[in-house]
């Protein structure tokens, strides 16, 4: 966003429950977090965020949710959010749907591509939502609602440094999975192999989102 010279502010809702006025915003990006959308008693800000998202969608604001952010948008649209059949941590092959191949955010993506994931929950496709990226066994990897609301289960925003930071901070993920279907070594190999193309596509995706009017 700095490269695009797009003015922005970053809010950490765990530290502050201050929400900006929607009239002051042109685009909204909801990032991930370690909490789940249904843990509202433990994280009370999630209730207020749900109302914020609903109003943003009703007013046609351009909104992009990533991982937890996608699940929050799905929930705001009355779709069910629940445990995925498997935890996806690391690099996974995804595919564009017919809708996805025509979508402005993904028009420069190949039909199949590798993406970085870190999630244990998934969501049903909202009513009137369009699935634009899919995979197996977690089919709802990205959706669009209307013209301006997007939810992405994968992480186009990550950096190599952030991947290493997550593996350090959430080390227990690699100890509790029985049997393990991912490892730090596999993730590092995937990052080495995929990073140049993936980081470029991530920049394109965010740039395309910021270009929505």
Specify the residue positions occupied by each region the protein language model found.
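Glycine-rich, phosphate-binding/catalytic loops in enzymes
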Residues: 1-3, 44-48, 81-82, 133-134, ...
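Cysteine-nucleophile active-site neighborhood
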Residues: 30-100
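C-terminal and late-domain segments of enzyme folds
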Residues: 133, 138-146, 151-213
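N-terminal beta1-alpha1 cap of cysteine-dependent amidohydrolase-like domains
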Residues: 1-59, 179-213
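Pocket-forming structural segment of enzyme catalytic cores
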Residues: 77-161
């Amino acid at each position: 966003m700095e490269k695009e010279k797009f003015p922005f502010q970053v809010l950490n809702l765990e530290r502050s429950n201050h929400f900006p006025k929607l009239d002051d915003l042109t685009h909204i990006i909801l990032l991930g977090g370690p909490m789940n959308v249904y843990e509202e008693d433990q994280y009370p800000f999630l209730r207020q965020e749900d109302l914020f998202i609903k109003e943003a969608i009703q007013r046609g604001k351009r909104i992009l949710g990533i991982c937890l952010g996608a699940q929050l948008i799905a929930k705001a649209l009355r779709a069910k959010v629940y445990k995925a059949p498997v935890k996806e941590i690391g690099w996974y092959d995804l595919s564009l749907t017919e809708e996805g191949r025509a979508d402005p955010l993904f028009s420069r993506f190949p039909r199949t591509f590798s993406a970085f994931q870190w999630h244990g929950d998934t969501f049903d496709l909202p009513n009137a939502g369009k699935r634009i990226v899919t995979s197996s066994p977690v089919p709802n990897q990205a959706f669009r609602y209307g013209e301006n609301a997007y939810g992405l289960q994968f992480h186009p925003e990550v950096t190599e440094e952030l991947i290493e930071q997550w593996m350090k901070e959430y080390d227990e993920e690699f100890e509790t999975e029985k049997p393990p279907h991912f490892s730090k070594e596999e993730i590092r190999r995937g990052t080495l192999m995929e990073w140049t193309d993936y980081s470029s596509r991530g920049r394109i995706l965010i740039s395309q989102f910021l270009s929505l009017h």
